[in-house]
Design a protein with these regions (language model features):
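Catalytic cores of transferase enzymes with a strong primary signal for eukaryotic protein kinases
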Residues: 7
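N-terminal core-binding DNA-recognition domain of tyrosine recombinases/integrases
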Residues: 10-21, 27-90
Length: 90
């Protein structure tokens, strides 16, 4: 059964002892992933999917006049990296 990023992230958040603020940041990234809507199951994710998502996050932050769109995209990248690395080890 293909695993989605949301399923993997929920399991990751349950497995790790993270602060409430950190959990909320991860959930924010998941909401962005869902809004983006072009994700594939983890087993079929390619570099281009991640790159397109991060570009979308950056462009959205610029359009929303965010104070630091680069930081926003970097945080999303860090969250994806942590969840995907953890999921691939499971």
């Amino acid at each position: 059964m293909p695993r989605t990023l949301r399923t993997a992230a929920e399991r990751y958040l349950r497995a790790k002892a993270l602060s409430r603020g950190t959990r909320n940041e991860y959930r924010s990234t998941l909401r962005k992933w869902d809004q983006w809507g072009h994700g594939a199951p983890i087993e079929k994710l390619q570099r281009r999917h991640v790159r397109e998502f991060l570009d979308w996050v950056y462009e959205r932050a610029v359009a929303d006049h965010g104070t630091s769109p680069g930081r926003t995209a970097n945080k999303a990248r860090e969250h994806l990296r942590a969840v995907l690395s953890w999921a691939w080890e499971q």
